[in-house]
């Protein structure tokens, strides 16, 4: 079975020029402020996968942000390992006067190892955002939501006891046996 999961910020490792970053865990118009000036950056850790993968299909940074102006701020977004070594990087923009969603490159391999991501790679993944430049004047960009979308495979369930405390079970085919 394949699972798609969005990993959000769990803790900030370091930050310069960024405030209220805890506001970025949901798309809810509560925003972090990102100062558009030299030296502004943030490194943050992500939540862990909720299930144990048999393999990782892909990882992709996605964000909703704005520049509060018709101008644009250019930032780099990097995936880092737990030692802050860069796995990959891509420039993106914070632009327009309302939240704008952007999906960055889908990565199927860890550029450090040239192999597929492992569960440990993903569970220790960090993201770094760094201010690069701007077109016009952008004083402060706002980040509403940022996450890493991970698609992974999990083992199919094996035969055994299913315990359901509430809800419904839908069976498209097969038999159900009930024992006391």
Question: At which residue positions do the language-model features occur?
Answer:
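Disulfide-rich extracellular domains of secreted proteins
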Residues: 1-157
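Viral virion structural and adsorption modules
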Residues: 158-180
């Amino acid at each position: 079975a394949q699972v798609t999961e969005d990993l959000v910020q769990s803790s900030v490792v370091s930050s310069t020029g960024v405030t209220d970053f805890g506001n970025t865990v949901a798309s809810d118009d509560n925003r972090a402020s990102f100062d558009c000036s030299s030296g502004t950056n943030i490194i943050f850790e992500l939540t862990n996968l909720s299930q144990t993968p048999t393999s990782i299909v892909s990882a992709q940074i996605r964000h909703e942000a704005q520049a509060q102006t018709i101008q644009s701020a250019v930032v780099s977004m990097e995936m880092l390992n737990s030692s802050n070594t860069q796995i990959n990087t891509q420039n993106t923009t914070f632009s327009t006067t309302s939240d704008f969603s952007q999906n960055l490159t889908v990565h199927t391999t860890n550029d450090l190892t040239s192999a597929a991501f492992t569960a440990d790679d993903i569970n220790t993944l960090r993201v770094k955002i760094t201010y690069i430049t701007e077109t016009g004047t952008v004083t402060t960009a706002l980040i509403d939501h940022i996450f890493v979308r991970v698609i992974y495979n999990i083992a199919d369930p094996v035969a055994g006891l299913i315990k359901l405390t509430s809800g419904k079970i839908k069976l498209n085919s097969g038999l159900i046996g009930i024992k006391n």
